[in-house]
Amino acid sequence: IVIALITAVAVAGLLRLKVDDSLAELFRTNTPEFRTYEDIDRRFPSSEYDALVVVEGKSLLTRDGLTAFAGATSELQLADGVSGLVSMLSARSKPDANGYAAPIVPDDLPEDPSGLATIVAALKSNDIVKGKFLSDDGELALIVLSLDRSVVAELTAKTVIGGIKEAAERELNPHGLSVKLSGAPVMQLEIRNAVERDQLLYNGLGLLF
């Protein structure tokens, strides 16, 4: 009877276990430096809620690749939990006489190779884009997503990040472009999944022994 009661209590406790996947909680310390970090984070929300989508492929800067990339950014902007994004397509040319700064990559890409080559050259030489949102060889690009904390808390990080990955792969994979996710929210999810697996394993072993 005693063993049965202990087992029942252990199972009830196991079902109520929660994992705090915040990187801030992971590295929490009772130091002035950490308290300063918390104060700054409250005033200026940090990149702990920025997810990175890494797009890679030899066809990235072709007409087909850029069209697919643009489609992916549009889909990601509408994905649950995404409040905004920045990519190489955010780059603008110098303002004209009226003060309008046109996007370097227009919505309608030119059909002729020379016109496309001019756009690609401007993109690769842009100070904001080169080495930050686009690799020097033109085969790797970065999309930075700003996530809505309240939506992530409501839907869970697993749902939001899973939706982002699914949308990106759907738009890019058919065009020979691979997708990888990185950034603090993705790391948080990996930590959470690993800790939950370990908890289940160790609690299961505890019940057995």
Residue ranges and their predicted role:
Residues 24-27, 58-63, 151-153:
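Second-shell loop/turn segments in exported
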Residues 54-56, 70-96:
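Short amphipathic beta-strand/extended segments in non-transmembrane regions
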